[in-house]
Design a protein with these regions (language model features):
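Charged, low-complexity intrinsically disordered terminal segments
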Residues: 1-265
Length: 265
């Protein structure tokens, strides 16, 4: 797809504030997907707003992973499960819940939905690594460090809608029609972007293969900022080749000056 440069957020509180603005501005629908989702005293305004939007006629769909209630971060001390949102008209799907049927089929327990994305009215698309929970957005200076990116793009929103509706329809008896949410796109962004989606059961491609291909095609610069800087032999070879052909290559490995990561948070 073609996109322009996104808004970038590296602070949970700042993203929380921007997320509230985007949700408050929704007129037609809000599609939200997260890995760990739960409320807390600091996040109550967000979930209150989702309830208000649903009551006002805005379609609100929320997908959270089935492990959300087993959150082992600092969130566990203040969390409130989100099942109550259904009473206000919010459409809530718990992806692969921790149930007896999954226990007798253990392979299904390891497949989690780790994506975090949001689509507003088919024109705003957000993606990144922040969960919708206390430790990602509501813990002040103790917030985990991650990032979110907001694109004003109908074209990218349509791709996200495809993914969201597929996940929803696989897990819910209340089906969504993606054509009800998509919009026609005539925009042409300044940059090319790719959405890489890997299904652990169906996909024959790998993340390392994707990164290797991008690195091999680079001509001027590469910047990597991984959370866990582990690469396989093919990626290492691609990076060496890039350096040898004169590509400016930087890898930043994150450290936490607060000592937070070392405490297991």
């Amino acid at each position: 797809v073609s996109v322009n440069l996104p808004e970038m957020y590296f602070n949970g509180e700042e993203w929380y504030s921007r997320m509230m603005e985007l949700i408050d501005g929704a007129d037609e629908y809000i599609l939200l997907s997260t890995f760990l989702g739960s409320s807390s005293p600091t996040l109550e305004p967000l979930f209150n707003l989702l309830e208000q939007k649903a009551k006002s006629g805005v379609k609100v769909y929320l997908i959270i992973d089935g492990t959300s209630n087993l959150d082992m971060t600092e969130t566990r001390f203040v969390m409130t499960p989100l099942g109550y949102l259904r009473d206000s008209g919010v459409n809530l799907l718990i992806y692969s819940p921790m149930s007896f049927t999954h226990i007798v089929n253990p392979s299904s327990l390891i497949v989690r939905d780790h994506r975090k994305m949001m689509i507003i009215d088919g024109s705003v698309a957000a993606i990144g690594g922040m969960n919708i929970n206390y430790i990602s957005m509501g813990a002040g200076e103790k917030c985990q460090r991650d990032s979110m990116y907001v694109f004003s793009s109908v074209e990218l929103s349509n791709l996200f809608i495809d993914e969201f509706v597929q996940i929803w329809n696989e897990g819910s008896i209340k089906k969504m029609d993606k054509d009800e949410f998509k919009k026609e796109s005539t925009e042409k962004g300044e940059y090319k972007a790719w959405l890489f989606n890997r299904n652990v059961f169906k996909s024959q491609v790998s993340l390392s293969g994707m990164f290797g291909s991008l690195i091999n095609d680079s001509t001027s610069s590469i910047f990597l900022c991984p959370y866990l800087p582990t690469i396989d032999s093919n990626m290492a070879k691609s990076l060496r080749n890039a350096v040898e052909r004169g590509v400016d290559t930087e890898i930043w490995c994150s450290t936490d000056s607060r000592g937070y990561a070392a405490k297991g948070g």
